[in-house]
Amino acid sequence: MNSIEFPLLDRTTQNSVISTTSNDLSNWSRLSSLWPLLYGTSCCFIEFASLIGSRFDFDRYGLVPRSSPRQADLILTAGTVTMKMAPSLVRLYEQMPEPKYVIAMGACTITGGMFSTDSYSTVRGVDKLIPVDVYLPGCPPKPEAVIDAITKLRKKVSREIYEDRIGSQQENRYFTTNHKFHVGRSTHTGNYDQGLLYKSPSTSEIPPETETFFKYKSSVSSHELVN
């Protein structure tokens, strides 16, 4: 047991009785039982999949991948997150029991990556949706970098006080509702799906600068184009 991470556990009496605090004991028990929920959407997740093999053997950290958010205390997001996927990601995070942690893996998850400049449907950073504990940059990050991120998360857990974490999350609320677009001009060339275009019945020609507008409804599965 590391006496640097748990200094109170190093205090023993002549009868070999260990004195510690409930927070240190709880943190120590959670260090070897981080059960991740793998949320991979693109190529970054392929690098994480290599950790399952014998070369890296992430089982030594107590990582047991779960398929249900109710059994996980760590969600690892890898890849691009779109506006349509955002409500599902937030729902998965909210279904995880406390305490829960997030590792953002890859440039696309952290900032939107190469899609951040010209994509209208990409979330520019998963931290706009859920709180992130460890950022793991790279395109894609190497498996060694993933292990380093897990090590840093374990150090954070070892020094954590549960009450302080809950209080911080209650004060700093994150975006937990569906994305909604405001009415705006068509992007770039304006070559939308012809079935979605709406033409005014009063005029046959529409000026280029006001050709099409789009409005994102509360439902994430449909778009409506209006004047």
From Swiss-Prot:
GO CC annotations on file: chloroplast thylakoid membrane; respiratory chain complex I
Catalytic activity: a plastoquinone + NADH + (n+1) H(+)(in) = a plastoquinol + NAD(+) + n H(+)(out); a plastoquinone + NADPH + (n+1) H(+)(in) = a plastoquinol + NADP(+) + n H(+)(out)
GO MF assignments: 4 iron, 4 sulfur cluster binding; iron ion binding; NADH dehydrogenase (ubiquinone) activity; quinone binding
Keywords: 4Fe-4S, Chloroplast, Iron, Iron-sulfur, Membrane, Metal-binding, NAD, NADP, Plastid, Plastoquinone, Quinone, Thylakoid, Translocase, Transport
Source organism superkingdom: Eukaryota
Gene3D superfamilies: 3.40.50.12280
Main localisation: plastid
Quaternary context: NDH is composed of at least 16 different subunits, 5 of which are encoded in the nucleus.
Family according to the record: Belongs to the complex I 20 kDa subunit family.
Function, in words: NDH shuttles electrons from NAD(P)H:plastoquinone, via FMN and iron-sulfur (Fe-S) centers, to quinones in the photosynthetic chain and possibly in a chloroplast respiratory chain. The immediate electron acceptor for the enzyme in this species is believed to be plastoquinone. Couples the redox reaction to proton translocation, and thus conserves the redox energy in a proton gradient.
Protein name according to UniProt: NAD(P)H-quinone oxidoreductase subunit K, chloroplastic
Organism for this UniProt entry: Drimys granadensis
